[in-house]
From Swiss-Prot:
CDD domains: S-AdoMet_synt. It comes from Chromohalobacter salexigens (strain ATCC BAA-138 / DSM 3043 / CIP 106854 / NCIMB 13768 / 1H11). This is S-adenosylmethionine synthase. Its cofactor is Mg(2+); K(+). The keyword Metal-binding applies.
């Protein structure tokens, strides 16, 4: 039985100030990792009225036109004019990038890649549930889809009065079996042009966004709708609020349904276990649930800086396991190598896939094949193919099921 009769999660659009910062940080990471797979990247961004500040520690042999990159990200989101609150063409870009500390580097780098130490101490969680096809909790899954739909309508000109900044929040009702059965409340706030009538806005948002995203059987007569509940939302983006990398860690993960170790993802290369171990945790948990070993699974993994082997691995299936949690831990250790370098190899993480993750959730996305081209120092071009969102694969579920004897 689920602990909650009601549960709420929220999401924000790609035009939310904090998400602008996340996307810039991950665009910098992508640009570098496409050229230098040995790079160390920890990139933080702040955006506020008329300025984007990029700071952090980066050690790389690659060169990136950071100012041009920042402007392209901002423009691609839709901030192309001061009329909408931010202009990627004219904003100031301040570069405060330094190099990684030699003290950190000596704890991470090893002559044998498999002995690579964790980039920091910390604890990370992975989670999966069978309540949706994406193996994600319904509140966060559909909250993401609402703001994703808002961006789709805006970018395709179907609701041309929409602007980039938006937030969603969903309260789901759960039944006695712990399954989502209805939406109790919908909150959707979207930035808009000043000349749109609020009644028209609410009608169109309800019809074209909410009812297009949420299954009809979950929208009942008692569902409450709060669409732009404060009225006008003309001023948004970095004018309305300062945006910072790493400020939406619950939006990025499981919407509060699972625990969080506290480390943000964006702007960090895979040597940072804050990111790579959280991805591995999702991979493990999703395969455990897909294998039918449990209906819900949360895994915790922890590390010490400079040490390759995790300091702990634990599993909680919340009473839904078909075998004991201790047995699942044994299977996890047998089928998944959770040392930092092994995670990078297992999930093939040294590719420019990270800006894709920086809006609408790092988890619950469909993995897909894509490619990119890079040029070496001799001027030769190379094409590499990789899987985006590789931690969403369920390719180890069969092996886990067989090993569990199910």
């Amino acid at each position: 039985m689920n602990e909650y009769s009601l549960f709420t999660s929220e999401s924000v659009s790609e035009g939310h100030p904090d998400k602008i910062a996340d996307q810039i940080s991950d665009a910098v990471l992508d640009a570098i990792i496409a050229r230098d797979k040995q790079a160390r990247v920890a990139c933080e961004t702040m955006v506020k009225t008329g300025v984007a500040i990029v700071a952090g520690e980066i050690t790389t042999s690659a060169w990136v036109d950071l100012e041009d990159l920042v402007r392209r990200v901002i423009n691609d989101i839709g901030y192309t004019s001061s009329d909408v609150g931010f202009d990627g063409n004219t904003c100031g870009v301040l570069n405060l990038i330094g190099k990684q500390s030699v003290d950190i580097a000596q704890g991470v780098d090893r002559s044998k890649p498999e002995d690579q130490g964790a980039g920091d101490q910390g604890l990370m969680f992975g989670y999966a549930t069978n309540e949706t096809d994406s193996y994600m909790p319904a509140p966060i899954h559909y909250s993401h889809r609402l703001v994703e739909r808002q961006a789709e309508l805006r970018k395709h000109g179907l609701l041309p009065w929409l602007r980039p900044d938006a937030k969603s929040q969903l309260t789901f009702r759960y039944d006695a079996q712990g399954k989502p059965c209805a939406v109790d409340a919908v909150v959707l706030s979207t930035q808009h042009d000043p000349d749109i009538d609020q009644d028209e806005l609410r009608e169109m948002v309800k019809r074209e966004i909410i009812e297009e995203v949420i299954p009809a059987e979950w929208l009942t007569e008692t569902t409450k709708y709060h669409i732009n509940p404060t009225g006008n939302f003309v001023i948004g983006g970095p004018v309305g609020d300062c945006g910072l990398t790493g400020r939406k860690i619950i939006v990025d993960t499981y919407g509060g349904m699972a625990r969080h170790g506290g480390g943000a993802f964006s702007g960090k290369d895979p040597s940072k276990v804050d990111r790579s171990a959280a991805y591995a945790g999702r991979y493990v948990a999703k395969n455990v649930v897909a294998a039918g070993l449990a209906e819900r699974c949360e895994i915790q993994v922890s590390y010490a800086i400079g040490v390759a082997e995790p300091t702990s691995v634990s599993v909680d299936t919340f009473g839904t396991g078909k075998i004991s949690d201790a047995k699942i831990v044994e299977l996890v250790r047998e089928h998944f190598d959770l040392r930092p370098n092994a995670i990078t190899r297992m999930l093939d993480l040294l590719h420019p896939m990270y800006q894709l993750t920086a809006a609408y959730g790092h988890f619950g996305r469909e993995p897909f094949e894509t490619s990119y081209t890079w040029t070496d120092v001799g001027g030769k071009q190379h094409v590499e193919t990789f899987t985006a969102f590789p931690w969403e694969k369920t390719d180890r579920a069969d092996a886990l099921r067989q090993a569990a004897g199910l």
